[in-house]
Amino acid sequence: MLPTVNNNIVIALDAMGGDFAPLSVIQGAGFFLDNLVDPGIKVFFHIYGDQKEISPLLLKYRKVSDNSEFTHYSNNVLANDKPSFALRHRKDSSMKAAIEAVKKGKASGMVSSGNTGALMAISRFILGTLPNVYRPAIVSVCPTKAKSFALLDLGANVDCNVDSLFQFALMGSMFAKIALKVDNPEVALLNIGTEEVKGNDSVRGAFKLLKSAPNINFKGYIEASEFLEGNIDVIVADGFVGNVMLKTAEATASTFIDLIKQEMFNSWATKMLVGILLKSKLNKVLMRFNPKIRSGAMFLGLNGIVIKSHGNSDAVSFAHAIKFAVNSINENLNQKIISEVNQVE
């Protein structure tokens, strides 16, 4: 049974994680409540952080205050903390408290913009992994010109062996079935070429395993130049390559969006033309590729819902990370993945 407060889904928030915290977190919670809550779903927040910084914000953002419970934690995980240091020395941090809320059943999931390595280390220590999962991976849903796809790993595992890549493909396929509603997801390994001989030992080894796996619809290698075509449902990479690919794509999208706006709206004449002919269609395309609405990434394989928002997330980005958490909980994602894993086993 999901933790609830007055029948609301409960989300724990690490209010001190991220470049613009706690303002981005409290504003983000408010933006979510005002704009992103689906009909019929009610959400309540457990907020953890420094009272001196957060209390004035809760007074200002009354809707958040009215739909939350706040607990003071003066310690927080810093951006440059190594995972091992955070695990040993940030025991009274807002991040750890939010994760423990999930472990203790006070919340159904948590969201943080904090240090990725620390968040993974603390989450794995407190929550553990799902049955038969060796290493969790970070997964996010990315847009293409045709459809969305799941990309993993995005930084949890910089170096991956053959077995890890194989399991990421398996978990990614399950994630796509549940989150993307794809019956038989097509899975590909990210590589520097499509020939079987290309890539490092881990990638080539994973290729051999996936090629013979009866429960994965494996389509071989995919190059970075092809991922926006929308022909694949799941793309698998080690955490180093996946993270670089995602951030490069997001930076490109942001730059492209800014350039379009700059060129389209640099005079009253073009403003009029765009307004008359292109505004609705242009906005639809720009929103589809806007990184802010794709901010959330899930730590897939943990025994609990943990969502990572970008460290530089603003209120809108953080709000969409909250929405990702709520959707994952509402879909009962982890229990469905456990069921899928058991069927494979």
Swiss-Prot record:
SUPFAM superfamilies: Isocitrate/Isopropylmalate dehydrogenase-like. Coiled coil: none annotated. Pathway: Lipid metabolism; phospholipid metabolism. It catalyses: a fatty acyl-[ACP] + phosphate = an acyl phosphate + holo-[ACP]. It comes from the Bacteria. Catalyzes the reversible formation of acyl-phosphate (acyl-PO(4)) from acyl-[acyl-carrier-protein] (acyl-ACP). This enzyme utilizes acyl-ACP as fatty acyl donor, but not acyl-CoA. This is Phosphate acyltransferase.
